[in-house]
Amino acid sequence: MSIELDLQIACENENGLPSEKDLMTWLNAVIPQFQPQAELTIRIVDEKESHELNHEYRGKDKPTNVLSFPFEAPPGLELDLLGDLIICRQVVEEEAIEQNKPLLAHWAHMVVHGSLHLLGYDHIEDDEAEEMESLETELMQGMGFEDPYIAEK
């Protein structure tokens, strides 16, 4: 069981970001439950890059907390490459304040949430959202964090 992480820090201020060790802890709590090996990129960006990508790929004219770009292997090619997570530092920090959550817990939630997207989970339909949120809650609580959706319940 191994996870290869390509960590890219593409924001001006690196102070207060989760460590690579934190990111690996969170990834190891999720991915091995679905597949034994994986390779992925986590790119931590500023609002400008998040806004541009969110506009280009989702048609949304604003930055967002996390974007997931699953790798789609050509037919007949099997790779452990999961894809890329793009996480916007400022949005995560603002949401943590708005939702009255510890910042580290919200970072963990964004990594868990994005990883589940890379593994094929989605939340477009209500039943999918319920399944994904339930799994996120279970994984977060398994790492000692509170239910990330407690404020919505």
Swiss-Prot record:
E.C. no: 3.1.-.-
Binding locations of Zn(2+): 113, 117, 123
Coiled coil residues, start to end: none
UniProt xrefs under InterPro entries: MetalPrtase_cat_dom_sf_prd (IPR023091), YbeY (IPR002036), YbeY_CS (IPR020549)
Transmembrane regions: none
Gene Ontology MF terms: metalloendopeptidase activity; RNA endonuclease activity; zinc ion binding
Alphabetical UniProt keywords: Cytoplasm, Endonuclease, Hydrolase, Metal-binding, Nuclease, Ribosome biogenesis, rRNA processing, Zinc
Cofactor binding notes: Binds 1 zinc ion.
Compartment annotation: Cytoplasm
Function: Single strand-specific metallo-endoribonuclease involved in late-stage 70S ribosome quality control and in maturation of the 3' terminus of the 16S rRNA.
Protein's recorded name: Endoribonuclease YbeY
Organism: Aliivibrio fischeri (strain MJ11)
